[in-house]
Amino acid sequence: MKQLHVQRYLEKVRSRKQHFLYPLLFKEYIYAFAHDYGLNGSIFYEPAEIIGNDNKSSSVLVKRLIIRMYQQNYLINSINHSNQNRFIGHNNYFYSHFFSLMISESFAVIMEIPFSLRLVSSPEEKEIPQFQNLRSIHSIFPFLEDKLSHLNYVSDILIPHPIHFEILVQILQCRIQDVPSLHLLRFFLHEYHNWNSLITSKKSIYVFSKENKRLFRLLYNFYVFECEFVFVFLRKQSSYLRLTSFGTFLERIHFYGKIEHLLVVYRNYFNKTLWFFTDPFMHYVRYQGKAILASKGTHLFMKKWKCYLVNFWQYYFHFWSQPHRIHINQLSNYSFHFLGYLSSVLRNLLVVRNQMLENSYLIDTVTKKFDTIVPVIPLIGSLSKAKFCTLLGHPISKPIWTDLSDCDIIDRFGRICRNLSHYYSGSSKKRSLYRIKYILRFSCARTLARKHKSTVRTFLQRLGSVLLEEFFTEEEQVLSLIFPKTTPFSLHGSHRERIWYLDIIRINDLVNH
């Protein structure tokens, strides 16, 4: 019923060829969507937990908050007279936090509506289910296996942050022409920055991203889209160049100005002539705030791309020059962290004897293979942060879980272990996972022993087989069927086959620490 209201309103807006999203802020059903899965049903979105379940979101409350936000010096007056204002309450930080969550979640919902409907109403709607497997994170690795083994250099790129809020609003303005909504967003972000500077000492955008996840993801995705749009434009321009007698491609690249909308490409940001060595074997992969640019070209070619990106960040997004965010390395001598894996290109030297009639000779052949392994030390650091072990990897108990039942404790530890094994099924060295499983298994035993005030040895003797079965993953069972001669216990050390799954759509929290 609620979704029907939204669709009717948007059909009316679409018939008038207008994009008025601001009135939706004052529709009661929007605030039900803002805190459940109602609108998009996406598993990527986790509903926000507003402080205090008794404080229900409503259009009346939001209207009051917006009016107060527009009042002059209301924040200073509210701090000085907080005891006299029942609406704000005794804790101004509670009020500001509650206000920011409510407004940001609702604002993000109405901003997502046009793009969600655009996707649903697209002519390719029937073809979308055929490509659901491409959503899997593991679908990236077969691509890297096929491409990186033929390339020479790789650039690790950290997308610049934090970005100024005003730049984010200007980027969003290219897609949404609703002036009142953008004005409210700009004012809200400005006031939120003032709250952080008055109430806390943290002024970074990191604070905003932690407390307003949905709105931050929306703004951040627009920002990344802007970066990649220009990057793709430059890549296409460099591929259209003509071949010279020296075997290089030279061309002047122009940046077009953003005049009317985002589809007009960029210009007038560089006054100098920019030179490119084109390379048909260039590949770009990004996840979250990190990207990889790999090429078969020379080191000079990669340095020119680095120069382009740094200048683009500086002139278009008004960043200070940040060349340290791009590191160029030779693939044959470098291992890079990406999506929780430690990846590299291995060189194997093969000697082949060739026999021709009475003569024989040896041929040295070099083969390259893309390799992925488990980064054990970072994972142990993540387990240490989560209080499963010490910094040295010694298992410790989890006191916060001692109030749970024995089955729940074993199930939680087993689920973490299975998720990690499932995600790292693409590792060529399964032995690295054995240490992680050892830590989780003994942490589980120590937690149970702490709960029952007993010793670890007692519980290992009593629940040894149960714990072993709980930490024995489905991947190992599948591999034992594929390789019947290999025992389950030797899979940790001897098996090197990699399995990529097409149902992994997010990184485990322990992987992403």
Swiss-Prot record:
Single GO MF descriptor: RNA binding
GO cellular component, one term: chloroplast
InterPro entries for this protein: Domain_X (IPR024937), Maturase_MatK (IPR002866), Maturase_MatK_N (IPR024942)
Localization in the cell: Plastid, Chloroplast
Principal localisation: plastid
Annotated keywords: Chloroplast, mRNA processing, Plastid, RNA-binding, tRNA processing
GO BP term, pick one: tRNA processing
A Pfam family it matches: MatK_N
Homology family: Belongs to the intron maturase 2 family. MatK subfamily.
Function text: Usually encoded in the trnK tRNA gene intron. Probably assists in splicing its own and other chloroplast group II introns.
HAMAP family the UniProt entry points to: MatK
Protein name: Maturase K
Originating organism: Typha angustifolia
Gene name of this polypeptide: matK
